[in-house]
Amino acid sequence: MTIAPLSASPMQLSPSPAGQTGAAAQASAQTATPQAMAATAEAPGLAALQSVLAVARQSAASSQDGLAVLMANVLRATATGNLPPAVQSAVQQLMGLHLSTDKTPDADAVKNAMASSGLFTEATLAAGAEPPVDLKTALANLAREAERWLAKTPAQNQPQTQGASPNVPPPMRGGPPTAQSPAAPSLPENALPALTAKLLATGSEAALARQTLLQMASLPDANKPAESRWIFDVPLMTPQGAAVAQLIVQRDARGTSTESPEPVWRVGLAVDVEPLGPVRANLALSGGHAWVTIVADRAAALSKLQKDSSWLSDALALVARDGDIAFQSGNGATAPAGRLVNSAS
């Protein structure tokens, strides 16, 4: 994947906590800017705001789940051909937001995935724009239409489903990126419509709770208002089914030394698809230099990635970046030392 520094345009919108629209969303969008956060750092109501956010975070963490199981259920439900038109339309909107794996994603594809991640839904609405076509909007539409479908089922026929354990840990600020591998559907084959509606509704609500946590993890830190961080999930469609990668994009306030005073951009990526299995990549950009570290859990995957890494060297040279590339084993063993890529040579 060729990743260039992302422009500031999609990042000018600060993420807002879930459930805010209209005036509330506008107020949230305004107060979520780094400048406003710094200005209100000592405001009397800050403790109350932090308390509200803590309660909301705890509530979302207890009910969140990833997209992989929901998308697996969506694929199984779609295969029956029995979905009501409104539910089918909501399903198509959701599934249309996955990142294509037919070709190697470039920087524009990653930028578009970030813009449609759902991080900026309320901020976009507060700015007076049309409702965005993004993950959060699509999940809300599916949850609403699945609930309406379920409501048409007689109460005595509605299934009583047990709350399943989450398949992915909740996202937390400062944590590493976490991938979701393709999951088996929890929806049985030939399931009754009521059960299909129930699982689509509860799965969408759990994914929406996760969106809330992603937005909270992406809010500016009042103690570091000049630094920016965005964490978001990216659905993928693979031959094994629907998977979800996670990206963390971060901009430090300034460089780490007087020799490198420019801000440092950092990108963390986690993905878990066959045949490579769990893979994580970390990219740092400062000035004209790039540092890339690729970590794989499987020895065979690590060997293949290292063997096929010439494209990464070429990509760095193409954008005139000197670069250090290192490969590491996820089990603690370290691969042979990385190499220096000199774009001037």
Each language-model region and where it sits:
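Extended non-catalytic alpha-helical interaction modules
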Residues: 1-278, 282-345
